[in-house]
Amino acid sequence: MDHNDHVNLLRPANLNQGGVYADLGAGNGAFTLALRELVGLDATIYAVDRDRSSLNELDAVHRARFNTSRNLIPLNKDFSHPLDIPLLDGVVMANSLHFFKDKEKILRHVHGFLKPNSALIIIEYNVDSGNMWVPHPLTFETYCALAPRAGFSEPRLLARVPSRFLKEFYSAVAFTM
């Protein structure tokens, strides 16, 4: 996938300009950069990841692409633990949910980061069995059953992109209730 694919997986969510967002499991920021393109430079984005070097790379790329790191807040943290962040207008979880076996528990935890009627966008492999690199993926159909149990609306499929590894990626949005 390239930057255009990342943007196109997020774009159909129609996120508002400005606001406060988080990319949970941001890594080197592929989806953080796509999110920035869609919500603008006035939005605050928390890029949360356990890997400090990936966050440093993201900060450098963000500065190069947008001529600033203003409103980008890298957090070298594990998002499955409490975070000292304000309530969010939206969360992106791109290829981070599949590392958790108990997805409902993680989604309930993430729900606590969000304001009412806020968006959770996930990007995942559209398969239910994984491998050592993608241990616990979930299909869109599985996510549709899971999200309401964690306090979210019925998810809406946003886009699909082919994958060389595990069939395809999908993006979906669900809202806090």
Predicted segments with their positions:
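Conserved alpha-helix/loop element of class I SAM-dependent methyltransferases that forms part
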Residues: 1-19, 34
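Class I SAM-dependent methyltransferase SAM/SAH-binding core
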Residues: 22, 27-81
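A short acidic, Gly/Pro-enriched loop at the edge of an enzyme's catalytic core
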Residues: 80-91
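A short SAM/SAH-binding and catalytic strip from SAM-dependent methyltransferases
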Residues: 89-103
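A short glycine-rich, Lys/Arg-flanked "PGG" loop and its adjoining helix->strand segment in the class I
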Residues: 104-116
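Short alpha-helix
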Residues: 136-151
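Core SAM-dependent methyltransferase catalytic element
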Residues: 161-177
